[in-house]
From Swiss-Prot:
Keywords noted in UniProt: Mitochondrion, Ribonucleoprotein, Ribosomal protein, Transit peptide
Compartments, as annotated in UniProt: Mitochondrion
Classification via InterPro entries: Ribosomal_mL43, Ribosomal_mL43/mS25/NADH_DH, Thioredoxin-like_sf
Record protein name field: Large ribosomal subunit protein mL43
Quaternary structure, from the entry: Component of the mitochondrial large ribosomal subunit (mt-LSU). Mature mammalian 55S mitochondrial ribosomes consist of a small (28S) and a large (39S) subunit. The 28S small subunit contains a 12S ribosomal RNA (12S mt-rRNA) and 30 different proteins. The 39S large subunit contains a 16S rRNA (16S mt-rRNA), a copy of mitochondrial valine transfer RNA (mt-tRNA(Val)), which plays an integral structural role, and 52 different proteins.
Tissue spec: High relative levels in skeletal muscle and testis. Lower levels of expression in the heart, brain, placenta, lung, liver, kidney, pancreas, spleen, thymus, prostate, ovary, small intestine, colon and leukocytes. Expression is coregulated with TWNK.
GO cellular component terms attached to this protein's record: mitochondrial inner membrane; mitochondrial large ribosomal subunit; mitochondrial ribosome; mitochondrion
BP GO annotations: mitochondrial translation; translation
Family statement drawn from the similarity comment of this UniProt entry: Belongs to the mitochondrion-specific ribosomal protein mL43 family.
Length: 215
């Protein structure tokens, strides 16, 4: 079966467990052992020596021990979400049973299936995953990639735009300095006066503004 056909889920905890206070999901452990069966020797030793210490480390877990004639000893784990896990402890030592019980106590009760990604967020950011260059300037030393390769055309463009822009002079204002312009024929920089509007065209506007203000 392919990966798309197998069940999978995103990495998530039960009801955001651990965000505020951690609640252990294991609710109950039930041991079924035999009093005199050879296959239940390790389970009997675990109940006699280790079960009290496990109960002290996990005060929220209820432990039941059922001593009855059985061929295969087992432990049944019940979780808060209703999941039930049954594990066989047939002919296992005390150390193996302790490791198995601790694994059951650390689980959340969810199905052990394939995790799609090792990280997951319910509210993804438009910036994506954080990396060392997050919120850093995207240009190298303040220059765009085209300016880094050939800065001369960018300067020529700025000079050309400043030379073409018209300037309006009002009466009594000082004359602006001459700006270098680009000759379209020879493609060389020449010193020429910037184009400006005549001051005579502004004279009819000034009395009109004065009349409105005086009225």
């Amino acid at each position: 079966m392919t990966a798309r056909g197998t069940p999978s889920r995103f990495l998530a905890s039960v009801l955001h467990n651990g965000l505020g206070r951690y609640v252990q999901q294991l609710q109950r452990l039930s041991f079924s052992v035999s009093r005199d069966g050879a296959s239940s020797r390790g389970a009997r030793e675990f109940v006699e020596r280790e079960v009290i210490d496990f109960a002290r480390r996990n005060p929220g877990v209820v432990i039941y021990v059922n001593s009855r004639p059985c061929c295969v000893p087992r432990v049944v784990a019940e979780y808060l979400n209703g999941a039930v896990r049954e594990e066989s402890i047939h002919c296992k030592s005390v150390e193996e049973i302790s490791t198995l019980v601790q694994k059951l106590a650390d689980q959340s009760g969810l199905d052990v299936i394939r995790i799609r990604k090792p990280f997951h967020t319910d509210n993804p950011s438009i910036q994506g995953q954080w990396h060392p260059f997050t919120n850093k300037p995207t240009t190298f030393r303040g220059l765009r990639p085209r300016e880094v390769q050939d800065p001369a055309p960018a300067q020529d463009t700025g000079l050309r735009l400043s030379a073409v822009a018209p300037q309006i002079l009002l009466p009594g204002w000082p004359d602006p300095p001459d700006l270098p312009t680009v000759d379209p024929i020879s493609s060389s920089l020449t010193s020429a006066p910037a184009p400006m509007l005549s001051a005579v065209s502004c004279l009819p506007i000034v009395p009109a503004l004065t009349t409105v203000c005086s009225a």
